[in-house]
Design a protein with these regions (language model features):
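Membrane-embedded alpha-helical signal segments
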Residues: 1-183
Length: 183
């Protein structure tokens, strides 16, 4: 039955898209680099293995893919890393910096080539609350927001989303709080 087969293919593709980061390891990253090096050898040699190891690059790519960010422009990813990797080694921060450099491609993806992008803009007071609840340790940064405050923030974003003239799945925040809002 073609309907069942089509549904099975769609479900399989959907699963693979959601879990794509699980299939991106060190070997796959090295394969991507080998392919890119055939076309852009100087770009690859400028970034890998110094200042970015294949292990670190795999971690950054995985984080981007987990968020649905296309890594099709691997050259652009490497060029972004070349600009910041000498000063930054945290894969979370590197992924955020690469993501910010890919803003045009992300916007194009979200607007499907259109001009307008409807967003929910996070209130600066909420951002300040989140910013104040970020704890930084040697092991990384984490959010120490009280559960009640977290629920209030989520409700506030949901209300803003529901009252928008054209509902959006995009919540616009300052870069330093974005990954905590995303969670």
């Amino acid at each position: 039955d073609r309907g069942l087969a089509g549904h099975l293919v769609e479900e399989s593709l959907s699963f693979l898209r959601r879990r794509a980061a699980d299939f991106l390891g060190i070997s796959e990253t090295q394969n991507l680099l080998d392919q890119l090096e055939q076309v852009w050898p100087a770009t690859v040699r400028q970034v890998v293995p110094k200042p970015v190891t294949v292990i670190l690059l795999a971690d950054v790519l995985r984080r981007l893919v987990e968020e649905g960010v296309s890594i099709r422009d691997l050259r652009g990813v490497l060029e972004s890393l070349a600009q910041v990797a000498h000063a930054e080694k945290d894969p979370l921060n590197l992924a955020e910096l690469v993501r910010a450099n890919m803003r045009r491609a992300l916007t194009h993806q979200l607007t499907e080539g259109g001009v307008d992008l409807e967003v929910v803009l996070l209130d600066p007071m909420i951002e300040d609350t989140i910013r104040g609840a970020i704890s930084r340790t040697a092991a990384g940064s984490y959010l120490t927001l009280a559960p009640a405050a977290a629920r209030d923030i989520v409700r506030s974003v949901q209300r803003a989303h529901e009252s928008a003239s054209a509902p959006s799945n995009v919540v616009l925040t300052q870069p330093d709080v974005r990954r905590f809002v995303r969670k």
